[in-house]
Curated annotation (Swiss-Prot):
The modification Phosphothreonine is found at residues 276, 640. Residues 119-128 have a biased composition (Polar residues). Residues 155-230, 284-360, 400-477, 925-1001 form the RRM domain. It holds the Pfam family RRM_1. One of its GO terms (cellular component) is nucleoplasm. Residues 247-262, 631-881 have a biased composition (Basic and acidic residues). Residues 263-278 have a biased composition (Basic residues). The modification N6-acetyllysine is found at residue 319. Residues 119-147, 247-278, 544-587, 631-882 are annotated as: Disordered. Coiled coil: none annotated. This is RNA-binding protein 12B. GO terms for biological process: regulation of RNA splicing.
C-alpha cells in the first residue's frame, strides 16, 4: 500500500535526485517525488510500503543540501489538493481567502480533505474532537462548521494545531496586519502547551480576517482557525468587556496594515479600559502544586523574580488546620503571568513545582471547598465545642506514620532504623507486626515527629533493602489503631522502666511481667530473649569464661569451681579423686594464686572454705604429716601475730621444701606423662628441663602411693560413681595413668630395636632381589588376559601430572624408604595406625609368603591392625603401581584433604587412584565433578547426589591460585560400587545451567 509523506524545509536548489539520495535504501516508485516548493520548501514523497514510510519518518531532522528537513504523514488527497492550489496560484488567483472564490475553494478543499481522511486509514486533526482541554477537562463543542462563515460573530477565534513551543509573538506574526488584543495558550495538566489557543481581536472585522488564515502554515504546521466565544475566553482566564466596547471599536477605522499593532493596542486600551462584569480586580491566576511545606511568601517572591508580586497576591491552601502543598498566585499583568507559566516544573526547595493556569471561578470554588471545612473546624475549636472525639479525629488526621511492607520476616528494629538512617528514630517509634504464632510478617509501623518528616520518608518507597523491595505507605494514627497499635497510649515511664530492667538483666521482671511487650521488641522477639537468658544460665560454666553478660553475677556457689553443678561441696573437700579430676584445670589456678600473690591471702580464711589450697598442700607434703594442726593453732592467734610470724616460720620454709624439691617428684613427672600439652603452655617453663632428669624410681612410685593408695586409706567418703559418670574425665585422667606409663617403656625402648634393626634387614634384602628378577614371572602367572589391559591405563597414568610414582620409581628404587618411617609413625602418632603401619601400600610390594607371615611374627602390632585383603594379594593389581596413602581423615577445617588447602590437584607423594584398578568394593572411592557452575556450593552438590551414599564432609570444591572456583569438586563415596552407580546415573545431569561430568579418581 502506497503511503504519502509530506516534506518541509526543502532548499530551493534541491531536486528529486537529492530527495531520492536522502531516502537511500527505501523504495520510492517512479514518479513518487512531487516538489511543491514555496517559502516553506514543501514536497510530497510516495513510498511503496508502510515499512518504508515508517523508516522514512524516522529520518526527520536530517539534512538535504545543508538544510534541515521535517517529515510528516500525509495522504494522496492532501497532496492532490495542494498541487491544485499551487497551480491556481500560478494562474494568478492570489492568496486563498483574498476573495469569495478563494473562500469557496478553501471550503471545498476542507470538505474534500475531511472526506478523504474519513476514508483513509490515517486520522486527521479535523475529524477529531474539536473541544479543547485544560487540566484534563473538555469545554464546549468547537467542531468546525461545514459551511465556514464569511464574517466573525465575535472578536474571539480558536486556534488548533499550534507548535508546542509557540509564543504570543508567533501568533501575532501569523495574523500579521490584524490587531490582536490578547492570546491565551491552553495547557495540559502538567503545564505543557497542548497546541490550542484562544485569540482575542480588537474587532469583529479583524476576527473575520483571521478566519481567512485557516489551514495556513505556522512553521511546519497547518493551523486550524475556528470561531470562538466570549464564554470560553472568560473561562480560561480572560477578562470580559462591556457590550459597547466592541461596537465602539467596530465603528473606529482600522489602522493601515503597516501600522504597528502593539501601538494600536496601547491606544485602544487607553480609550476603552477593560472592566469585569463582577467588578472584581483585574488579574491572572495560577495554581501552584507540589510545594514544600516549609516555604513562605518570601520564597515565592524570590521564585517569581522579575514580577510585581506582593504577599497579598499569594494564598496558601489549608485543610484541617494543616497546610497543603497547593497555593494560588494572582498576577496583575499578562507579562508576569506568562513569566510565571514559563517556570513550570522548576525546582523549588528540592521539589519540582507544577504551575497551571486557572480561572478565577475555579479558584474560588477550590478555596470555598477548603475554607468551609476549615471554618467548621474553627467553630469546633471555640470554648465549649471541644470534644474528645474531635481531638482524636484531629490527631488521627495527621499522617505521621508509615506502614512498611515486604521486609524480611526476621527483620529487627535496628535494621528498620538503618533503613531510615536519615531520620532520628527511637526504638519506641517502631512497631514490628507478628502473626498469631509469633512469626514475623515482614511488616512494621513507624511513627515520625512531624508530617513533613513522614512525607520525606515516603520517598524511600520501593527502595531495595536486605534483598527485597520495601513498600511504604503514609497513614494516619486512626489507621494505625486498626492494627491494634496506639503509640499515644504507650507510657514512656513504663517503657523506661522496662528498658532499665532489661539493661540490668532482671530475669524475674522479664518472666513475671504480664504487660504486653510494647517496646523495642515484639511479643515473639521478647520471648526469644527470655529463652536466650535461660540458656545462658543453664550452660553456665565459669563466670569469667562462658557467662556472656558480665553484669549478671551468679550465686556464690557457682564461683568456686566449674564442677559445682556435678558435685556438692562436701564431696570436693574430702575426695582425693576430685583433686585428681580438676587437676588439669585447677592445678594451674592455685599455682598462679599461691606463688604470685602475697602469701597472707591463704590465711585470711580457713582452709575448709577454700578447698583449692588444701589440695596443693596435700600434694606437697607427705601423707604422714597432718598439715591441719599448725593452721588451727595459727588461726587461734591474733591477726598481728599471724601476719608477723607465719611468713617467717611456716611460709618461707615450707615453700622452699614444697616448691623446689617435692614438686619435682610429685607434680612434674605425673603431668609429664598424663598432661603432656598443658605443662608446655603452663607455668614454670624454665623448669621444664627437670622433667627429663628424674630417675625411673620416682617416675613409678609417686603415682602408686599418691594416686592409688590414698583414695582407699584417707578418702573413703567419695563414691566411685562420680568418677565413672563423666566419660571425658574417665578417659583423660585415669586411662592415661594406666595406659601411657607402660607404653613408653614398652614402645620407646623395644620397638626401635625390634623394628629398626631386624625388619629393615628382613625387608631390604628379599624385596630388591624379588622384584628385580622374578616379578615378571611371578606376577604374570595367574590371568594373562587381565594383565594385558592394565598396561594401557598404566601408560595413561604415566602421562598425567598427578601420578608422581610411575612403576620405574616403585620397583627400581630401594623399598627401604617405605619401611623405615611407617614403624616410627605407627607408635609416635597412634591416630594413623590403620593407614601408616606396614599396611596395604607397603605389603603390595612383598611376596605372598611375607604378607602372610609378617603379622604372625610381630605380636606388637596394634590391635586394630588387619592384614590386607585378597584384593591387594592379587598379582595383577599389585604389579600395576604403588598406591600411596590418600588421607580421608577429618582435618581441622572439617573437610576432607584432597590437596594443599583444597587448591588444585593432589600434592606430591600422593596420586589419584585409577578408576579401573580393582581396589575393592568396600573402600572409600573419590569422584571428580567437572563443569560445575562457579557459584555452586556444598549443599547443591549434596542435593545432586541425593539417594547415594556419599560422605557428607568429603565435598571439596577446587579453587585456583587466585582463590576463585575452577568449576570442579571432589566427593567421596563409601564404596566403589556406589561410586560407579552414581557415575552411571548422574553423568551429564544438570547442576543449575550446566551439565556436569563425573569421573573416578
Amino acid at each position: 500500500m502506497a503511503v504519502v509523506i509530506r516534506l518541509l524545509g526543502l532548499p530551493f536548489i534541491a531536486g528529486p535526485v537529492d530527495i531520492r539520495h536522502f531516502f537511500t535504501g527505501l523504495t520510492i516508485p517512479d514518479g513518487g517525488v512531487h516538489i511543491i516548493g514555496g517559502e516553506i520548501g514543501e514536497a510530497f514523497i510516495i513510498f511503496a510500503t508502510d515499512e518504508d514510510a515508517r523508516r522514512a519518518i524516522s529520518r526527520s531532522g536530517g539534512f538535504i543540501k545543508d538544510s534541515s528537513v521535517e517529515l510528516f504523514l500525509s495522504s494522496k488527497a492532501e497532496m492532490q489538493k495542494t498541487i491544485e492550489m499551487k497551480r491556481t496560484d500560478r494562474v494568478g488567483r492570489g492568496r486563498p481567502g483574498s476573495g469569495t472564490s478563494g473562500v469557496d475553494s478553501l471550503s471545498n478543499f476542507i470538505e474534500s480533505v475531511k472526506e478523504e481522511a474519513s476514508n483513509s486509514g490515517y486520522g486527521s486533526s479535523i475529524n477529531q474532537d474539536a473541544g479543547f482541554h485544560t487540566n484534563g477537562t473538555g469545554h464546549g463543542n468547537l467542531r468546525p462548521r461545514k459551511t465556514r462563515p464569511l464574517k466573525a460573530e465575535n472578536p474571539y477565534l480558536f486556534l488548533r494545531g499550534l507548535p508546542y513551543l509557540v509564543n504570543e509573538d508567533d501568533v501575532r506574526v501569523f495574523f500579521s496586519g490584524l490587531c490582536v488584543d490578547g492570546v491565551i495558550f491552553l495547557k495540559h495538566h502538567d503545564g505543557r502547551n497542548n497546541g490550542d489557543a484562544i485569540v482575542k481581536f480588537a474587532s469583529c472585522v479583524d476576527a473575520s480576517g483571521g478566519l481567512k488564515c485557516h489551514r495556513s502554515f505556522m512553521g511546519s504546521r497547518f493551523i486550524e482557525v475556528m470561531q470562538g466565544s466570549e464564554q470560553q475566553w472568560i473561562e480560561f482566564g480572560g477578562n470580559a468587556v462591556k457590550e459597547g466596547d466592541v461596537l465602539r471599536r467596530s465603528e473606529e477605522h482600522s489602522p493601515p496594515r503597516g501600522i504597528n499593532d502593539r501601538h494600536f493596542r496601547k491606544r485602544s486600551h487607553s480609550k476603552s479600559p477593560r472592566r469585569t462584569r463582577s467588578r472584581s480586580p483585574l488579574g491572572f491566576y495560577v495554581h501552584l502544586k507540589n510545594l514544600s511545606l516549609s516555604i513562605d511568601e518570601r520564597d515565592l517572591r524570590n521564585f517569581f523574580r522579575g514580577t510585581d508580586l506582593t504577599d497579598e497576591q499569594i494564598r496558601f491552601l489549608y485543610k484541617d488546620e494543616n497546610r497543603t502543598r497547593y497555593a494560588f498566585v494572582m498576577f496583575k499583568t499578562l507579562k508576569d503571568y506568562n513569566t510565571a507559566l514559563s517556570l513550570h516544573k522548576t525546582v523549588l526547595q528540592y521539589r519540582p513545582v507544577h504551575i497551571d493556569p486557572i480561572s478565577r471561578k475555579q479558584m474560588l470554588k477550590f478555596i470555598a471547598r477548603y475554607e468551609k471545612k476549615r471554618s467548621g473546624s474553627l467553630e469546633r475549636d471555640r470554648p465549649g465545642h471541644v470534644s474528645q472525639k474531635y481531638s482524636q479525629e484531629g490527631n488521627s488526621g495527621q499522617k505521621l506514620c508509615i506502614y512498611i511492607r515486604n521486609f524480611p520476616f526476621d527483620v529487627t528494629k535496628v535494621e528498620v532504623q538503618k533503613f531510615f538512617a536519615d531520620f532520628l528514630l527511637a526504638e519506641d517509634d517502631i512497631y514490628l507486626l507478628y502473626d498469631d504464632k509469633g512469626v514475623g510478617l515482614g511488616e512494621a509501623l513507624v511513627k515520625f515527629k512531624s508530617e513533613e518528616q513522614a512525607m520525606k520518608a515516603e520517598r524511600l518507597n520501593r527502595r531495595r533493602f536486605l534483598g527485597t523491595e520495601v513498600l511504604l505507605r503514609l497513614i494516619s494514627e486512626a489507621q494505625i489503631q486498626e492494627f491494634g497499635v496506639n503509640f499515644s497510649v504507650m507510657s514512656s515511664e513504663k517503657m523506661q522502666a522496662r528498658s532499665q530492667s532489661r539493661e540490668r538483666g532482671d530475669h524475674s521482671h522479664l518472666f513475671d511481667s504480664k504487660d504486653p511487650p510494647i517496646y523495642s521488641v515484639g511479643a515473639f522477639e521478647n520471648f526469644r530473649h527470655q529463652l536466650e537468658d535461660l540458656r545462658q544460665l543453664d550452660n553456665f560454666k565459669h563466670p569469667q569464661r562462658d557467662f556472656r553478660q558480665p553484669d549478671r553475677h551468679p550465686p556464690e556457689d557457682f564461683r568456686h569451681s566449674s564442677e559445682d553443678f556435678r558435685f556438692p561441696p562436701e564431696d570436693f573437700r574430702h575426695s582425693p579423686e576430685d583433686f585428681r579430676r580438676p587437676r588439669e584445670e585447677d592445678f594451674r589456678r592455685p599455682s598462679e594464686e599461691d606463688f604470685r600473690r602475697p602469701w597472707e591471702e591463704d590465711f585470711r580464711r580457713p582452709p575448709e572454705d577454700d578447698f583449692r589450697h588444701p589440695r596443693e598442700e596435700d600434694w606437697r607434703r607427705p601423707l604422714e604429716e597432718d598439715w591441719r594442726r599448725p593452721l588451727e593453732e595459727d588461726f587461734r592467734r591474733s591477726p598481728t601475730e599471724d601476719f608477723r610470724q607465719l611468713p617467717e616460720e611456716d611460709f618461707r620454709q615450707p615453700p622452699e621444701e614444697d616448691l623446689r624439691w617435692l614438686p619435682e617428684e610429685d607434680f612434674r613427672r605425673p603431668p609429664e606423662e598424663d598432661w603432656r600439652r598443658p605443662p608446655e603452655e603452663d607455668f614454670r617453663r624454665p623448669l621444664q628441663g627437670e622433667w627429663r632428669r628424674p630417675p625411673e624410681d620416682d617416675f613409678r612410685r609417686p603415682p602408686e602411693e599418691d594416686f592409688r593408695h590414698s583414695p582407699e586409706e584417707d578418702f573413703r567418703q567419695s563414691p566411685q560413681e562420680h568418677f565413672r559418670r563423666p566419660p571425658q574425665e574417665h578417659f583423660r585422667r585415669p586411662p592415661p595413668e594406666h595406659f601411657r606409663r607402660p607404653p613408653p617403656e614398652h614402645f620407646r625402648r623395644p620397638p626401635p630395636e625390634h623394628f629398626r634393626r631386624p625388619p629393615p634387614e628382613h625387608f631390604r634384602r628379599p624385596p630388591p632381589e624379588h622384584f628385580r628378577r622374578p616379578p615378571p614371572e611371578h606376577f604374570r602367572r595367574p590371568p594373562q588376559e587381565h594383565f594385558r589391559r592394565p598396561p594401557q591405563e598404566h601408560f595413561r597414568r604415566s602421562r598425567e601430572e598427578d601420578f608422581r610414582h610411575p612403576p620405574d620409581e616403585d620397583f627400581r628404587g630401594p623399598p627401604d624408604e617405605d619401611f623405615r618411617h611407617p614403624p616410627d609413625e605407627d607408635f609416635r602418632s597412634p591416630q594413623e595406625e590403620d593407614f601408616r603401619c606396614p599396611s596395604d601400600e607397603d605389603f603390595r610390594q612383598l611376596p605372598e609368603e611375607d604378607l602372610r607371615e609378617a603379622p604372625e611374627e610381630d605380636p606388637r602390632l596394634p590391635d586394630n591392625f588387619r592384614p590386607p585383603g585378597e584384593d591387594f594379594r592379587s598379582p595383577p593389581d599389585d604389579f600395576r603401581s604403588h598406591r600411596p596413602f590418600v588421607n580421608f581423615g577429618r582435618p581441622e577445617g572439617g573437610k576432607f584433604d584432597f590437596g594443599k588447602h583444597n587448591m588444585g590437584s593432589f600434592p606430591e607423594g600422593r596420586f589419584m587412584p585409577d578408576p579401573k584398578i580393582n581396589c575393592g568394593s568396600g573402600r572409600v572411592t573419590p569422584i571428580k565433578i567437572m563443569n560445575l557452575p562457579f557459584k555452586a556450593n556444598v549443599n547443591e552438590i549434596l542435593d545432586f547426589f541425593h539417594g547415594y551414599r556419599i560422605i557428607p564432609d568429603s565435598v571439596s570444591i577446587q579453587y585456583n591460585e587466585q582463590g576463585l572456583p575452577t568449576g570442579e569438586a571432589i566427593v567421596a563415596m563409601i564404596n566403589y560400587n556406589e561410586a560407579m552407580a552414581a557415575i552411571k546415573d548422574l553423568n551429564d545431569r544438570p547442576v543449575g545451567p550446566r551439565k556436569v561430568k563425573l569421573t573416578l579418581l
